[in-house]
């Protein structure tokens, strides 16, 4: 999709950009694949904030997405490409030959009317899902499983892709979007192609109100808080941090401090760590 720029008719419009939604073919989602979505505002089951800067925003309905891609051997045809307010990628409605309808993540270059398939014998073409062991080296993939049958967990955001680098026994070597190279069980499924809507990251929100429509609340710097609220708070005027390294609101070091567990069970599957 192309990016649309506005003329600076006001301070809020100056610099604002939006996607033109030229790929979207309908604004009416499939009702049978909708579920209610209650807002959590970043709170857990105790009512405590566990994720800051969340709350408000436009009311949404959840679109039930097929991350497992387990409908083997039955061809499906792309009926629509739709906007999904719950993720950065677009979604595609698939009408299967047996009458079932499912949503999938819309890969780049997937068009209405194209046919897709799942299963070990599916062709290597955009939108088809098959086990990693059946995908040729060099192929770009997305929606990758970490355990067979669990459903895709990796590489689901707009514009992302991973590459199959090689095969070693029952494992397949994958380079992820972060630069990390890791081994994943060959029985795990992935979808061929890159995730669509790749220009999503280039959109400039433009004004605070638009962020609030998206459910994003303001981010307040620790240095302008009181000492009771943040380790950076207090002092007269623009005071320095007063510590040897920046801290989180809970007093833990941040900005470069490693938070990954020293003895993580998945370390044995990582060949090369992500780029810094």
Curated annotation (Swiss-Prot):
Keyword presence, Ribosomal protein: yes
Stored PROSITE patterns: RIBOSOMAL_L2
Keyword hit for Ribosomal protein: yes
Entry's Gene Ontology cellular component terms: large ribosomal subunit
Similarity remark: Belongs to the universal ribosomal protein uL2 family.
Start-end of Basic residues biased regions: 258-276
Function: One of the primary rRNA binding proteins. Required for association of the 30S and 50S subunits to form the 70S ribosome, for tRNA binding and peptide bond formation. It has been suggested to have peptidyltransferase activity; this is somewhat controversial. Makes several contacts with the 16S rRNA in the 70S ribosome.
Assembly: Part of the 50S ribosomal subunit. Forms a bridge to the 30S subunit in the 70S ribosome.
Origin: domain of life: Bacteria
Annotated gene: rplB
Keywords attached to this entry: Ribonucleoprotein, Ribosomal protein, RNA-binding, rRNA-binding
Cystine bridges: none
GO biological process: cytoplasmic translation
This protein's name: Large ribosomal subunit protein uL2
One Pfam entry name: Ribosomal_L2_C
Molecular function GO labels: rRNA binding; structural constituent of ribosome; transferase activity
């Amino acid at each position: 999709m192309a990016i649309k720029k506005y003329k600076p008719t006001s301070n809020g419009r100056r610099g604002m950009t939006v996607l033109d939604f030229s790929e979207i073919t309908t604004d009416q989602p499939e009702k049978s694949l909708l579920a209610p979505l209650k807002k959590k505002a970043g709170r857990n089951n105790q009512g405590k904030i566990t994720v800051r800067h969340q709350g408000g925003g436009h009311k949404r309905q959840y679109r039930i997405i097929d991350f497992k891609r387990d409908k083997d051997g039955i061809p499906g045809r792309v009926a629509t490409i739709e906007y999904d307010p719950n993720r950065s990628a677009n979604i595609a409605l698939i009408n299967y030959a047996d009458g079932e309808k499912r949503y999938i993540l819309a890969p780049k270059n997937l068009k209405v009317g194209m046919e897709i398939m799942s299963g070990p014998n599916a062709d290597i073409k955009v939108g088809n899902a098959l086990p990693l062991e059946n995908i040729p080296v060099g192929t770009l993939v997305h929606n990758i499983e970490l355990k067979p049958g669990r459903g895709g967990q990796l590489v689901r955001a707009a514009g992302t892709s991973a590459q199959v680098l090689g095969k070693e026994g029952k494992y397949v070597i994958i380079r992820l979007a972060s630069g990390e190279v890791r081994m994943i069980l060959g029985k795990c499924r992935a979808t061929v192609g890159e995730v669509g809507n790749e220009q999503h990251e280039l959109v400039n929100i433009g004004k605070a109100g638009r962020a609030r429509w998206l459910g994003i609340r303001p981010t307040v710097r620790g240095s302008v808080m009181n000492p009771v609220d943040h380790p950076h708070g207090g002092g007269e005027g623009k005071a320095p941090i007063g510590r040897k390294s920046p801290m989180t609101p809970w007093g833990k070091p941040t900005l470069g401090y490693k938070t990954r567990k020293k003895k993580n069970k998945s370390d044995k599957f990582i060949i090369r760590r992500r780029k810094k």
